[in-house]
Amino acid sequence: EYQETPSPKEDLEKIPMLARSDMKKEAAPFYNTELSVKGIPVVHHDIYSNGIIYLTMLFDIAHVPAEDIPYLGVLKAVLGYVDTKNYSYADFANEVNIHTGGISSTIGVYPSVKDKDDYQVKFEVRTKALYDKLPEAATLMKEMLFTSNIDDEKRLYEIIAELKSRLQVSISSAGHSVASTRAMTYFSKAAAYKDTITFYETLCDLEAHFDERREALA
């Protein structure tokens, strides 16, 4: 009832409003500095971040065959959720929460503004942490990337089954977005990396035939 009650005009007039003159015409500048650290290209963004460092590692995956693209989604789901050399996956999650604001992985697709068929695709691993926690964050990222036990078939099945269930709910609640992305795959190669339907079909197949596929998957 409170929300449905109209606000008096005098109260509405108290709400701060922006005039067109308050808005800047100039686009915000980029603060990008390209560096090379031990032969690795680095882009540094020198902007105020309230003492928090945002770190993203990018790995080129343009060489991955089209039929293997859905497995990148499986890899993304597995990293951080399996045991590593020094931690169980539960203990690893605790360490991540203690020292960082999270570690995640995703697939980044960067289309060209000039050519719809020209794009770059990267496998990205991200974290954010306070500056004095950067060594711990980097160590945990290294632990996850290089020592994750992706041969744990029982855990792999659990992750695949859970991911399939979550994706099923997501498709049901956002079918229009899923259909839109699928339609884009017919004229945009870059859209294939975001195709939820193909990924879901792959998960269904992996879950149904896990015993036959588990060794190849790992």
Residue ranges with predicted function:
Residues 50-82, 86-215:
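M16 family metallopeptidases and their MPP-like homologs
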Residues 1-67, 202-218:
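Proteolytic maturation boundary segments
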